[in-house]
Amino acid sequence: MEKEMLAIARLKSGEGKFEKFMGWMQSDKGMAVRKTIAHVEKTVPAIAPDKSYVMFKVSVHNEEEMKKFASGNNPIAKPIFDECIEIVQMYDLSKVKL
């Protein structure tokens, strides 16, 4: 079952954390992990003007693995999360009829 979620990741302070994290997310390794969790082609990113946090609207197909990934407990993603991510907050999204 596909589920829309919002992830807001606050980056640790320090030079180049944003670039390093986003580089990993777009790398072959990062894409492979993300594909096991969500439909990457449907992901919508947003970046804070000061690059202190990133936000992703994600179409999740494996919620348990998404929670594991976002909490920094995915074994492949753990090193980059430990180095670059301070905290991630997750939200369930639902469409609003207009």
Features from the language model and the residues they span:
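Short S/T/G/P-rich N-terminal loop/turn motif that feeds into the first structured element of a domain
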Residues: M1-K78, E86-L98
